[in-house]
Amino acid sequence: VRIGRDVIEVSTYRGSDTGHQEPRRGRAKKKILPNNVFGRREEDVLRRDFTINALYYDPVKEVVTDYVDGLGHIQERRLETIGDPRERFSEDPVRMLRAVRFKAKLNLRLDAKMEKLLPRMAGTLTTVSPPRLFEEIIKVLHNGHGAVGFQALDRYGLLQFLFPSATRHFGEQDLNKTNGLIPCALRNTDQRVADRKPVISPFLFSVLLWRQVQQASRMKSGGNRSIFENLHSSADGVLQELHPTVRIPRRISAVMIEIWELQIRLEQRRPRTIKRLLSHRRFRAAYDFLLLRAGAGEVSDSLADWWTEIQEMPPTDVQRMIQGLEQSKPQRKKSTRRKRKHT
């Protein structure tokens, strides 16, 4: 329900579904939750996940009904499940991601039993459908507190089950809290959310999978294929490997590949392509990515500074900078071989 610029989410009361107590399994043995069964408010409260998420507001009487001490837990800044957390997480493992999201966004303290259970039950995330996990990851990383949320995913052992291959490729350049690629990208995204600026999910996912794609591409180098062919082949392989866990929609992955490809072109700085790159629809995202890589020590600061400077220049100075590149490029030697005469 929209009220001015605010959005209030409304849900129906759900009752107990005696005919479908357990989630059914899809073809890939992933959990498919049963359809909603309408019920009374007293039934609905027992189906909620956390106490702070089980408050009922009457907009006419302006009264909040609290059956499970949710208001008290909010005041104590404590997150508790309704009932046994093991049972709640078994019913729907996505609740573990929701716990991390609430903790990060609202600065809550997790119940001690819940904290112990998260690492033990993290593996049950593999039973959740890949498209649903993609949506839940977006909610954790795009709510304005993604940096803290990512740390919590890592701390509780959830991250390795969301990105099993990518996490094995993470190194100091990726995870360093001061200038690592991922923490800096998440802090920048958090700031954009705070400033009410748009954020795009392809950017963060391109950062998260970059190291794996980069290393896979390097392993393919040296053959007959171009650097761009190797990149596309590696990107396809990485995304395909991730599919059973987290399924990134094609509309997202296509943008990710564009951002990765532009990293190569920005590093090459070929004079004939500079103006075309500056007008590329993904240039800004690729440029921001390049700045993060420079901060992490992956590319030189001078390269990042050059691309920063050329964007601020008038057209005549842009041409001068491009000419400077042409003059600095080593000239190819003309072939001295004589052309063969055909008889």
What residue spans do the PLM features occupy?
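Catalytic cores of the polymerase beta-like nucleotidyltransferase superfamily
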Residues: 1-343
